């Protein structure tokens, strides 16, 4: 049992660090604060994670691994209902690691490894969303023709921009409450709806009607 203690301690450090980063923002959380929250010495924290960047990088690695798994589902999206679920699932993961998006520019300016990995993440997101759109067109959920197909790359990029910066927008709207756990449900619904709204001009009539129906269902909470 004793041999497993360091592994449990390391995982507990990550869990508490993620919670503190999400609540207060990474720049506002010191390793001393993390140690105090855990009730361990700074030396014990240093033994497992010798620098704050080590914590950030490990949390990002967890996020990246989970994201890669979710993005693989993009080729299973064939209609608005599938797209809504796919995007909401992505937003749920972004919410779980929301400190990365809340403090994105600051983190990238200080961490070269994070900078290069996040660029790769954006590329994979765009590729996955483009795959989703192609699947929807092949399933006749999107309007046929060269005009729609020509618009897919730009639309995919626009969707990824909203997906990436939606929580920053929520935070600016209400800095004191937007990123609190109790607001997750509404924030994620709003995000999914606004990303899908970018598709509306290209949706086949019944799919457009279904998107509008979804928007009405979630109108009281989706904003």
Model-inferred region functions:
Residues 71-75, 101, 105-108, 140, ...:
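Secondary-structure edge/capping motif, primarily at the C-terminal ends of alpha-helices
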């Amino acid at each position: 049992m004793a041999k497993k203690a360091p592994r449990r301690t390391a995982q507990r450090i990550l869990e508490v660090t993620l919670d503190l980063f999400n609540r207060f923002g990474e720049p506002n959380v010191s390793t001393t604060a993390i140690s105090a929250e855990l009730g361990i010495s700074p030396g014990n924290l240093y033994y497992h994670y010798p620098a704050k960047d080590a914590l950030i990088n490990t949390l990002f690695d967890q996020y990246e691994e989970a994201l890669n798994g979710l993005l693989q589902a993009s080729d299973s999206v064939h209609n608005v209902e599938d797209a809504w679920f796919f995007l909401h699932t992505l937003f749920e993961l972004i919410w779980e690691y929301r400190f990365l998006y809340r403090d994105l520019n600051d983190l990238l300016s200080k961490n070269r490894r994070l900078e290069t990995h996040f660029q790769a993440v954006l590329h994979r997101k765009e590729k996955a969303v483009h795959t989703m759109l192609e699947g929807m067109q092949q399933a006749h959920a999107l309007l046929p023709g060269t005009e729609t197909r020509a618009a897919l790359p730009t639309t995919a990029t626009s969707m990824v921009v909203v997906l990436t910066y939606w929580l920053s927008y929520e935070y600016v709207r209400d800095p004191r409450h937007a990123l609190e756990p109790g607001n997750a449900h509404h924030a994620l619904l709003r995000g999914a709806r606004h990303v899908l709204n970018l598709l509306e001009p290209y949706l086949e009539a019944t799919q457009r009607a279904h998107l509008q129906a979804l928007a009405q269902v979630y109108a009281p909470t989706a904003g």
